[in-house]
């Protein structure tokens, strides 16, 4: 288990530990068709932090807009982390996903000492790919038939990465 992540403050949002009071909202967000398409049906335990990372609520003025998580390899020979995020449909199109990813990227590079971050959206999830590219992630390959979600068919995912030396120090922390 990694140390608890502190509250991470962005310009319009904060990333904080999920509380039991957040679970109903996050379950409802995950059940929305626009989110379920990429994440599948919510299951028990989905809102527990991973053993080798953390799961954080995306809090906008006290409202839970979604969640963002990271899983890390802490072996000093590797020091990298993977990131995932979902936002409720009502929050789409406002730049909040980009800001949340940028805030977490800053933390993972500056505080956790990672040298490489990855994210792997479905190749058909063009808004997510644009969001991650705006933060600085670049495509490096396609993970063929990588995952199955709501429709149970295999889908390709785009592997994107961001290296610490390529990161522009929070260029996308806000709108």
Outline where the language-model segments fall.
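Acetyl-CoA-dependent GNAT
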Residues: 37-92, 107, 163-167, 174-175
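Conserved acetyl-CoA pyrophosphate-binding loop and the N-cap/start of the following alpha-helix
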Residues: 91, 95-104
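Hydrophobic adenine-recognition pocket in adenosine-nucleotide-binding enzymes
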Residues: 18, 87, 121
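Conserved GNAT acetyl-CoA-binding A-motif
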Residues: 110-120
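Conserved catalytic-core motifs of GNAT/GCN5-like acyltransferases
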Residues: 118-121, 138-155
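A short, well-structured alpha-helix characteristic of acyl/acetyltransferase catalytic modules
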Residues: 1-48, 165-175
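Glycine-rich acetyl-CoA-binding "A-motif" of GNAT/NAT acetyltransferases
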Residues: 63-66, 127, 154
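Conserved active-site alpha-helix within GNAT-family acetyltransferase domains
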Residues: 98, 123-141
